[in-house]
């Protein structure tokens, strides 16, 4: 609730849903993952003899990735090692990035305090070049255990901070640089692009599609495959082509009371009207019974004209109707809203609907071709969270700007320690080449800018020692 204050007004409903969920689990004789921990803990607490027997089964208990454990898991580990006291944990508190699912990096400190443990620091880095390791040592989160990594590999290129004007230039630069590395003989699967949130990859997806570059998304569906983007495109398509029956069907079904039968009846009326020279919206009301409330649709499609720029059409549709629709229909509405807001910015670079749809059609066509073709070596596009535990020869980190990375909510709420750890994880994925991208505009989503965020001083790049990287100004140079 603390992180999702919008649900405070629904506390009673959420509590009732939770009660019913618990009852249904009991009724079906089922448990979930949390139950497995809770019931094991209760079993051991209520039955010391069982706990003793289970603990005696093991001479040693070893836990890897200990920084990602939660309170219950830590307590169970303590119990399982209670007879012999031989507990080994391996972890890096600087890489604890899963607090959103209950992970607690403080478990590392609690273990050290409670067990009077011996510490063996594993500080030899076999992955990265000395130049990358030097930069890594400067970004160890402030609240983590002191550590100083040592590189054993041969010298390599110094990390690069590449500055572009906006996210469009960023996408162009990254795509071009990726192609150069591939031309130099690096396997595409040895190249990764990391970002804080999935929406940061949208422009790059479009750019790589235009260049016919293969990529694999670990962070979510492709931009043009998402339901909310398809909804937006359907609205644009019916404005561009009022006879597009498939797009009319998708657009109409967004509105209350319109199902397949009603939408088919409306579409038939629209088709006849357009062929007779009438506007589609003039026909909608007359072909729908009074019980169906389509006031918003009539208003939206009646006011919007084909001559309006696509960004304004999307903005009005989003503001007047679709934003609320997302909130009502999807648990991840916030992420979907970010995608739509990013799409408005992308559309702002196009003068006409047809130009925008033409470029997006390239992505849709390439998606179909990829499905029918044999798997090709692909560059990886992924969030930092999905990249944990992986490594690549070449790593790009997108949008390292205050408000993007670190995340704006973390800045506003003053909870930056996890953002520092996420950045640390991102940088430590690189073996040979590291590119950190930032934008001179200050944020990749200026349309929802916030002065506090811009002036907060929470800029990861500005905190880097100047001798640890090369700064490239790549604006308009490619």
Residue ranges of predicted features:
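Conserved helicase C-terminal RecA-like lobe
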Residues: 7, 234-467
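Helicase P-loop NTPase motor core
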Residues: 116-118, 124-214, 240-241
